[in-house]
A protein has these predicted regions:
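A conserved short coil-to-beta-strand element within the FAD-binding core of flavoproteins
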Residues: 1-6
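Glycine-rich loop(s) and the adjacent beta-strand/alpha-helix scaffold that form part
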Residues: 15-18, 22-94, 316-319
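Short, well-ordered coil/turn residues at beta-beta hairpins
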Residues: 12, 24-25, 30-32, 122, ...
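Short, small/polar residue-rich loop motifs at catalytic or cofactor-binding pockets
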Residues: 112-114, 267-269, 312
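An anion/pyrophosphate-binding glycine-rich loop and adjacent beta-alpha core
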Residues: 69-215
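A glycine-rich dinucleotide-binding beta-alpha-beta segment and adjacent secondary-structure elements
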Residues: 208-211, 216, 222-306
Length: 331
């Protein structure tokens, strides 16, 4: 930085033995992927979110160490105030586990967990509309329950259910006709995954709902009443409790019954450096820092506390599109 202008960047070898200065004629674009793979930084900034996580899995972005965000802060930029992660609801745990140590836990990934089956807390009560975006349930649970894990409940009719649910984007288990999405598991592949997780002890398969409650320590009386009420919503095709769409309701009546213990898993951090519509980093006076541009998960001013994935590929689309537009801007 020369005066108030960013004019280049320094780089080094992995060992830090050799440093290189790179001069930038038109500006520096920061795009290092956020800080999801930096345990110290994540736990310092997102300790409250971490209470509801069993893992942090920055797919394909294992160098997301926060270097770009820190460099921008050193240059005088400011960061979003509220910590935000892209949290999915697919972290599966053993019955004896609880979330809260996302960088130190043994957990699994369960794709089917996003399907809108009945989900209850340790008290045996529903938490929210199970057809909501991935992290809505996690945030609702934090305000409702004594435990930051929940339980996914389904019965032997699940193959029909997941086809009727017709979820889209990365939650889809059934390939849509005429689409170019990469092949999901389908019914056969999902059945194999369920069987494997039953063998691992992460999914409980039982002949009665009472056995399900006992396996996880769920309040049995309340749980059985919740299932009865939920079956009534299915029969009436009307969820008077949370307003879930009728086609995403399911009955839980036909053994064998299945259940698993779930919590959140973070894929990326989304709180970054504040930018303007030209992708320029902003200082504490909301003024652009000349020569400094930020895109991708290093950039902020977009999400706030939640990842509302009401459109498939929302964050991937933002990163790709903003990268293209920023490139044009700087060029």
């Amino acid at each position: 930085k020369e005066g108030d202008k960013v004019v280049g960047a320094y780089a080094s070898t992995d060992e830090g033995a050799t440093f290189l200065r790179i001069n930038a004629a038109k500006g520096v674009i920061v795009a290092t992927g956020g800080y999801a793979n930096n345990p110290d930084m994540y736990m310092a900034l997102q300790a409250e979110n971490a209470k509801g996580l069993c893992g942090v899995v920055p797919f394909g972005n294992f160098n997301a160490q926060g270097q770009g965000i820190k460099a921008c802060l050193w240059a005088g930029a400011v960061k979003d105030e509220n910590p935000t992660s892209m949290v999915f609801d697919r972290g599966i745990m053993r019955p004896d586990q609880l979330p809260g140590a996302p960088f130190d836990m043994d957990f699994g990934y369960f794709h089917m967990a996003t399907q809108p089956f009945l989900k209850v807390d340790i008290e045996g009560e529903r938490i929210t509309n199970e057809s909501s975006p991935y992290d809505f349930l996690i945030h609702a649970l934090a305000r409702k329950s004594s435990q930051r894990a929940w339980f996914d409940i389904w019965d032997s009719n699940w193959p029909t259910d997941i086809q009727r649910f017709h979820t889209i984007g990365c939650s889809g288990l059934i390939k849509g006709e005429g689409t170019n999405q990469m092949d999901p598991e389908g019914v056969e592949g999902t059945a194999a995954i369920i069987d494997a997780l039953v063998e691992e002890g992460k999914i409980v398969k039982a002949d009665t709902l009472e056995e399900i409650a006992d396996a996880f320590g769920i309040n049995k009386e309340t749980f059985l009443a919740t299932v009865e009420q939920y079956n009534g919503f299915y029969d009436a095709q009307n969820d008077t409790q949370y307003g879930k769409e009728p086609f995403r309701l399911s009955e839980i009546r036909t053994a064998p019954f299945y259940a698993c213990k779930l919590s959140g898993m973070a894929l990326a951090t989304l709180d970054g450096i504040k930018i303007n519509t030209k992708f320029q980093a902003l200082d504490e006076n909301n003024a652009p820092i000349e020569g400094l541009y930020v895109i991708g998960n290093d950039s902020g001013n977009y999400y706030n506390g939640t990842y509302p994935n009401l459109a498939a590929g929302l964050n991937a689309g933002r990163c790709v599109t903003f990268g293209m537009l920023c490139g044009r801007q700087v060029a």
